[in-house]
């Protein structure tokens, strides 16, 4: 396929942006119609004498905005459902003002925090793994699952945390729950008495606030600055608080990281007071620059940190699968409450995640998504500079 446009290498605009713009113009004026197949990345790179990464960057941007649709082995096509658009030379009447932006004429853009790129999720692979787990499931897969979680998944999580987050724990210390909210419910039923005082980041994660209020906790807002939770302010406001809920790696919603001096100060306070730190380590797999920081739990020598993580923000939110790591001596108490609450996930989902981890798909998916998000950051930065 010979595309009806050329690139001007004398322009200051990046080549991938030119390529992206030429595709948009060709789609707008009808030279490329909905359903038309576009060249493969390798073929177009050879045709235009470009690096494959340049073509891939343009394609990813067009896919992200809904102009193209990737169909795996079937190739990439102009999105069939794409609404007709006007050529750039024709000025259309201004649309009425609306608070809801649309995504290439189709569905609204999803801009909520913590939502992964769902169009990049390996659905076929996931379906194959789930089907295999279902076929191989014995009686264990058809009855109520272990309230503590599927044993192979707990073992896989323990291995993953040791490698990626510096946390040394045994599978018996891990409890698989139906989302972060379920982790908080398990903690509150096991350790929190009526009216327990709890530090909470301000601003902080609204779901944590709601869950703790429903548990009857008395919340003490503690300000957050560019170093994360202000531990000195927390001590000044409620020195004898029994709990502190923090997002040290990627603060919600400000995105800052808790500095090492603050981490040590928080642990020192918890050790002296016998208080509990609830570490929400969501999104720790990603950083704008550098490698992820080790978890706060990895510095915990006295067993005062209750560590929570989730796969929902890395894989897909509908998974509703989180996990909680508790100190070894607290395992029996948490196990009793887990049996009573039944906040567990279906066996099939847990078994599929275990296979995804154990067979190396999770690590490959993370690497792929890190590259994708880095390109998205680049595109956003370029667009902001224009």
Regions found by a protein language model. Give the residues of each.
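N-terminal basic, amphipathic alpha-helical segments
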Residues: 1-133, 142, 153, 329, ...
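Conserved functional loop/turn residues at catalytic and ligand-binding sites
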Residues: 31, 66, 216, 281, ...
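Active-site PLP attachment segment
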Residues: 73, 298-333, 348
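Short glycine-rich anion-binding loops that position phosphate/pyrophosphate groups of nucleotides
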Residues: 116, 248-252, 313
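Conserved core of the PLP fold type I
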Residues: 130, 135, 140-274, 285-286, ...
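A short, hydrophobic C-terminal helix/tail in secreted or cell-surface proteins
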Residues: 382-386
């Amino acid at each position: 396929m010979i595309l009806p446009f050329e690139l001007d290498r004398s322009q200051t605009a990046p080549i991938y942006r030119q390529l992206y713009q030429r595709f948009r113009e060709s789609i707008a004026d009808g030279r490329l119609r909905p359903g038309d197949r576009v060249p493969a990345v390798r073929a177009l790179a050879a045709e235009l004498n470009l690096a494959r990464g340049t073509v891939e960057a343009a394609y990813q941007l067009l896919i992200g905005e809904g102009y193209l649709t990737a169909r795996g082995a079937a190739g990439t096509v102009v999105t069939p459902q794409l609404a007709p658009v006007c050529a750039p030379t024709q000025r259309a009447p201004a649309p009425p003002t609306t608070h809801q932006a649309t995504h290439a004429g189709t569905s609204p853009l999803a801009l909520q925090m913590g939502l992964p790129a769902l169009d990049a999720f390996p659905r076929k692979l996931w379906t194959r793994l789930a089907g295999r787990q279902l076929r191989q499931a014995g009686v264990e897969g058809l009855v109520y699952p272990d309230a503590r979680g599927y044993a192979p998944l707990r073992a896989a999580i323990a291995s993953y945390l040791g490698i990626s987050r510096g946390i040394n724990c045994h599978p018996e210390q891990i409890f698989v729950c139906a989302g972060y909210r379920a982790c908080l419910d398990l903690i509150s039923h096991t350790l929190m008495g009526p009216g327990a005082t709890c530090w909470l980041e301000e601003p902080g994660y609204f779901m944590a606030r709601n869950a703790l209020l429903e548990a009857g906790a008395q919340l003490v807002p503690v300000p957050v600055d560019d170093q994360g939770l202000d531990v000195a302010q927390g001590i000044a406001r409620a020195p004898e608080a029994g709990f502190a809920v923090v997002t040290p790696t990627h603060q919600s919603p400000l995105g800052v990281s808790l500095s090492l001096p603050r981490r040590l100060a928080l642990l020192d306070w918890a050790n002296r007071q016998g208080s509990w730190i609830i570490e929400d380590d969501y999104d720790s797999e990603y950083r704008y620059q550098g490698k992820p920081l080790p978890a706060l739990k990895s510095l915990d020598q006295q067993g005062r940190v209750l560590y929570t993580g989730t796969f929902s923000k890395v894989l897909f939110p509908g998974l509703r699968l989180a996990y909680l790591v508790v100190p070894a001596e607290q395992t029996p108490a948490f196990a009793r409450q887990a049996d009573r609450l039944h906040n567990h996930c279906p066996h099939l989902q847990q078994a599929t995640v275990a296979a995804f981890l154990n067979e190396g798909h999770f690590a490959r998916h993370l690497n792929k998504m890190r590259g994708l998000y880095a390109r998205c950051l680049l595109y956003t930065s370029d667009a902001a500079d224009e």
